[in-house]
């Protein structure tokens, strides 16, 4: 139920299972998501046949069951582009042809059962009584005048024997919208998906050792992410059982490939590694440690791959050179064939985003300060001076506030000194574009008025302090008055 509630209306869930529990999983999925939202079950061949198996039958497949939250989900993949023609009579208007007949008989559609005549040549094309024309005798002239009917003699290169419909590419694009060029997905997975051994090889190559057994391949996970995010390349991908973080690897690799901005959320219990395993000996105490390190190493590998760089001429059309870009980085020069260096590999855009943050679930930052009267004593009054737990850092408090305000945890932040106080700015804005900072926080004790004024003058959307930032109640009240003066629209909070 949690997974369903987290999905967007066009969201989808993929669940991997073996033969033993496939039936039960599909029944459970139908109960939670509804039978009508069952999408498909994809068979993934995870290994080659084994010989020492019960009944002499090797169960080589794993099943990936897919359910959608609603009928708004549509899977799409890149297909072979339709063949369009461009001719002199219709310059810059690509077109294609389509069958001009229907499955209706002459008895069913008598008004479409007529002999079609080419107005240019007078050649006749009798109707097939079992497949009448898609136009009527009355509408034929209009369709022909609009250029929507093509005869065999019009374009010999078509090699057709009967009239055909002409469809314009512009109409196809208008009708399909953002789905243009995409096609439905088959449950037959592509040949490059690989098996479990390929997944093991991938992670072994990354770590120079076998630190995780039988992970799924990056290509397998990439395939599923790709078919659900062909249109929405800013989708959020959540993996409840992230393991070695193959999903994170796949998201970063796919983003680098198609320029997407997909985000990943990996969830994993800190399951300890076997002390006899290679992973433990290599210093990875938990599966989480393996996943974090894989994301780091995979990210660095992706940044180094040539696919992340673009080829541009040494002398660009605008007259600038690659070195003119402040972000440009020349990687190598390519010989174009004449012995002269004519192309360089230059980074002309941002590097792939391979950053990530690690969070550990914990209880609240606040102390349990609700005591009954008999629980109070002179000895525990000192413990009640602060309502925040002693082991909490500024970042603990900052990200706790983000959760309270419902802000995303993936935005950039910076810390700086204003006077002697540490001030944190989360999701910095842009003064030139009149975009305010999302949040400014200061959790120091006894924050002076000049620091508060400086924060207020920046007019952030939100500002937060801790109770101990002020020596007295009047000072706390003064903070709100300062913001009313300098930044009346700022939401101020004291924790």
Feature-to-residue mapping (PLM):
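Cysteine-dependent PTP/DSP-like catalytic domain, specifically the C-terminal lobe
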Residues: 1, 40, 49-52, 223-234, ...
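Short, contiguous acidic/charged loop-to-helix segments that flank catalytic cores in large enzymes
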Residues: 206-213, 237-240, 254-257, 278-287, ...
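A phosphate-binding catalytic loop at a beta-strand-loop-alpha-helix junction
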Residues: 234-254, 402
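Long, compositionally biased intrinsically disordered regions
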Residues: 408, 426, 430-495
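Short, surface-exposed amphipathic charged segments that create phosphate/polyanion-binding patches used
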Residues: 53-60, 280-281, 371-378
């Amino acid at each position: 139920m949690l997974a369903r509630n987290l999905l967007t209306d066009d969201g989808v869930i993929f669940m991997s299972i073996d033969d033993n529990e496939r039936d039960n999983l599909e029944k459970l999925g139908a109960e939670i998501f509804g039978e009508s939202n069952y999408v498909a079950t994809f068979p993934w061949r995870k290994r080659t046949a084994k010989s020492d198996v019960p009944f002499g039958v090797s169960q080589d497949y794993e099943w990936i069951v897919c359910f959608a939250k609603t009928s708004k989900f549509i899977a799409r993949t890149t297909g072979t582009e339709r063949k369009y023609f461009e001719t002199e009579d219709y310059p810059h208007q690509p077109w294609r042809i389509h069958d001009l007949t229907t499955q209706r008989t002459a008895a069913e559609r008598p008004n479409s059962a007529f002999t079609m005549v080419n107005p240019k040549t007078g050649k006749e094309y009798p109707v097939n009584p079992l497949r009448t024309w898609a136009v009527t005798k009355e509408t034929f002239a209009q369709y022909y005048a609009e250029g929507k009917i093509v005869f065999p003699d019009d374009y010999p290169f078509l090699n057709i024997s009967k009239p055909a419909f002409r469809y314009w590419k512009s109409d196809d694009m208008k009708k399909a919208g953002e789905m243009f060029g995409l096609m439905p997905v088959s449950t037959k997975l592509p040949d490059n998906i690989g098996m479990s051994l390929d997944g093991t090889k991938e992670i072994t190559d990354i770590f120079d050792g076998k630190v995780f057994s039988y992970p799924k391949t990056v290509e397998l996970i990439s395939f599923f992410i790709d078919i659900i995010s062909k249109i929405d390349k800013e989708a959020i991908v959540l993996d409840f059982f992230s393991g070695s973080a193959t999903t994170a690897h796949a998201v970063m690799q796919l983003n680098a490939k198609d320029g997407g901005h997909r985000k990943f959320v990996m969830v994993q219990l800190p399951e300890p590694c076997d002390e006899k395993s290679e992973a433990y000996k290599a210093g990875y105490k938990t599966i989480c440690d393996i996943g974090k390190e894989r994301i780091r190493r995979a990210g660095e590998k992706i940044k180094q791959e040539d696919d992340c760089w673009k080829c541009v001429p040494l002398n660009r059309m605008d007259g600038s050179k690659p070195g003119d870009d402040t972000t440009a980085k020349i990687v190598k020069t390519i010989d174009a064939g004449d012995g002269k260096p004519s192309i360089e590999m230059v980074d002309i855009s941002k590097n792939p985003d391979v950053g990530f943050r690690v969070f550990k679930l914990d209880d609240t930052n606040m102390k349990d300060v609700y005591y009954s009267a008999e629980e109070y004593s002179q000895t525990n009054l000192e413990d009640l001076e602060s309502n925040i737990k002693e082991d909490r850092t500024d970042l603990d408090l900052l990200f706790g506030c983000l959760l309270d305000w419902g802000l995303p945890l993936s935005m950039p932040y910076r810390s700086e000194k204003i006077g002697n106080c540490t001030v944190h700015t989360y999701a910095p804005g842009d003064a030139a574009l009149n975009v305010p900072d999302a949040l400014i926080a200061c959790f120091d004790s006894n924050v002076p008025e000049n620091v508060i004024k400086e924060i207020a003058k920046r007019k952030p959307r939100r500002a937060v302090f801790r109770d101990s930032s002020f020596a007295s109640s009047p000072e706390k009240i003064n903070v709100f008055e300062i913001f009313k003066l300098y930044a009346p629209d700022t939401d101020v909070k004291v924790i």
